Amino acid sequence: HNNVIDKETLEALLHNEVKLQDYVDVAFKELFFNVSQDEKPEYNGVQLINSAVISRYLKQLLENDLRYTPFTFVGSEQPVQEDIEIKTPKGIIKSRIGGIIDRLDSKDGTLRIVDYKTGGDADTPPNVESLFTPAKKRSNYVFQTFLYAAIMCRKQPLKVAPSLLYIHRAATETYSPVIQMGESRKPKEPVEDFSIYETEFRERLQVLLEDIFNPEIPFTQTEIVEKCTYCDFKTLCKR
């Protein structure tokens, strides 16, 4: 960890097809086949296709990183959390917010919080308020990454740039994963220093949590039925 990643290292890796495929095979053995690294499981047709797609994504990611070099790799699969207090009519509840950040890297005084995505398109919320307003196209991904950014702003001194890296979009020369905000049909601003938005985000988050834990505010189903399609809790509400 805290390794400086340079252009030469990534170029050498990009040109080493055997090593890249080895990385993919190691992951398949560990996470899919659940076998030791000494074994050589046979891939069926679908698994071969998946392996090829992952290998291509890996190359696109490395090419995107190559354009960003040199940078410092800070960590991956990094758990972050923060203790919070929530006011309720019955007193204060102590709770905790947090999650796992896919990747952290730093360059020129900026810490990027990177969440990987393998499908869909980048969301561009108009403002912080929109993340807390029920809507069909509200960006849960941006909300999650902003939450991590708010936590990291208080844990270290660097500027924090929340980023969503859509791997299938990363091949273009000008691609940047840093989240952008702005009204439709107006210029978009990259969120390169989250501290500008942190206070508003935290204030709105506090209000949201207090509403959730307030027994006097009814817990109602969303009116946007499409949101229920992939909801983990639809077996409870029977929608």
Where are the model-predicted features located?
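RecB-family 4Fe-4S metal-dependent nuclease core
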Residues: 1-239
